[in-house]
Amino acid sequence: MTQITEKELKKKYLDLLSQNFDTPEKLATEIINLESILELPKGTEHFVSDLHGEYEAFQHVLRNGSGNVRAKINDIFKERLSTKELNDLTALVYYPEDKLKLIKSDFQSCGQLNVWYITTIEHLIELIKYCSSKYTRSKLRKALPKQYVYIIEELLYKSNEYQNKKSYYETLVNQVIELKQADDLIIGLAYSVQRLVVDHLHVVGDIYDRGPQPDKIMDTLINYHSLDIQWGNHDVLWVGAYAGSKVCLANLLRICARYDNLDIIEDAYGINLRPLLTLAEKYYDADNPAFKPKKRPDKHERLTQREESQITKIHQAIAMIQFKLEIPIIKRRPNFEMEERLVLEKVNYDTNEITVYGNTYPLKDTCFQTVNRDNPAELLPEEEEVMNKLLLSFQQSEKLRRHMSFLMRKGSLYLPYNGNLLIHGCIPVDENGEMESFEIDGHTYSGQELLDVFEYHVRKSFDEKENTDDLSTDLVWYLWTGKYSSLFGKRAMTTFERYFIADKASHKEEKNPYYHLREDVNMVRKMLSDFGLNADEGRIINGHTPVKEINGEDPIKADGKMLVIDGGFSKAYQSTTGIAGYTLLYNSFGMQLVAHQQFNAKEKILSEGIDELSIKRVVDKELQRKKIRDTNIGKDLQAQIDILKMLMHDRYLD
């Protein structure tokens, strides 16, 4: 193979680039454009975390931009519109289709409705002009409904200084109404406002878990204009199942059964659970209280006795399969240090007791009828067959393939972004705050390097789905449950104890020291520095652990260097947190933390226009307004400018 010098490579690269910029005027125009963009204010970043399948609450937070939409409406119209008019306009922007139906039903004549159309279109155009004031025209155009771009741009940039175009603008709007396009235009304008108030979305983990509609969240994210994802422990569990880990698959099926969410598997992703049910009905009883499904807070109709019976049996069957599948992984990976989790081998089947961590406990609600006490890891032939069928169904689900591929494409274990570190779980440390080490494939890693190696193996496992018991696939499961995992953040997962031991002391899961050390500003500064970030300016933005505001816990920790934004989208946590989640806004002026009250139904917002969700707290204000130049995107643009200037000097100025 012919060696190519750096000089030759540079020439070939510039030759290719010059094909796009074949005149100095074209090149100069692009440089001028990019240099100018660097001077614009940075766009608004929106941080959300721990969605846990709660689609209704999540989509509402997206629609209102964590209160940003109402703030913009107030900025412009507070002195000009009544409270009711402000509320109606807010509800219209949030839920345009639904609000339009309600408003139109109030009018007695077409004339009255047409006057409302004209006024509303004017208000929405004014709102878009305000929301887009820090964007280029090109970027704004991409946010507008394609079919109405020409009309909207004419109204946005109208100049009527000499009255020459007054009737032109009036005719534009009147024709929209006359040709029955007003509803669609208003709907398009409302969604444009939603898009413009947030430039970029960060999802700091756990799209999946016990909530009923993670698939709808994934569809929404796939269609979102700009975002990134930091994987959560539940997200990696689903990725692992799709990538070929049967133990990850058993875990997520068990969680779905426990929280009465098996319809995610069957209805949302089209996976047939009939073979699992057949197995469960053959071996398990319906009256085991430890395995009855939890009542779903969002589900109004109760399960029938038959449905509850089937789920209880499935729950036992898949839990036993999970405990069996864990054994060979723990044995072939001694570096995982999980010998205490060989739970089925630690059971005394004669006395119905177990000894774990030096303590012996009596067992309750047991269902060991498929366990071979001489070889507890052994699957029954029908258990093996069921898992093979389920794994094949998972990997052949087109919708699941689309969702998992998107998670891999947009996701990572952590992300340095605009000077901040975004991470779902933790950075594993010891009691002294030193990065904990973990051995993988004969090498020892810690801190950022450990997270990079974990991520490498997640991607390798995903790319090699046919391998189901290789190191990479085992490490995906370890991320779910291992003590040095940055996603789990605890010393052991006590699933077995929670089902079968009455003594709640055995259920306790000890957290990594990170979770109390993150209160220390010096510790957070050290972590930021270890990840190559400016400790004076940067922050860690964290999810994973619900903030118990009801007990006085503060999501702003370490003098504002650590922000924890899991306040409980999940309805199951809201009684312990006291709220329904935190989100974070970061615009060119600084950061605001937003606490959300429980989202009950959009009907109240539609009828009253009152959005009680958003209570803002200023985290800080920038001393100097941040520009695009100061962001990740700015660095990328500057790199492009440097190359274009190199081309200019090479081809046109020398």
From Swiss-Prot:
The keyword Hydrolase applies. It is an enzyme of class 3 (hydrolase). InterPro entries: FBPtase_class3, Metallo-depent_PP-like. Its cofactor is Mn(2+). Gene3D superfamilies: 3.60.21.10. Residues 288-307 are annotated as: Disordered. It catalyses: beta-D-fructose 1,6-bisphosphate + H2O = beta-D-fructose 6-phosphate + phosphate. It comes from the Bacteria. One of its GO terms (molecular function) is fructose 1,6-bisphosphate 1-phosphatase activity. Its EC number is 3.1.3.11. This is Fructose-1,6-bisphosphatase class 3.
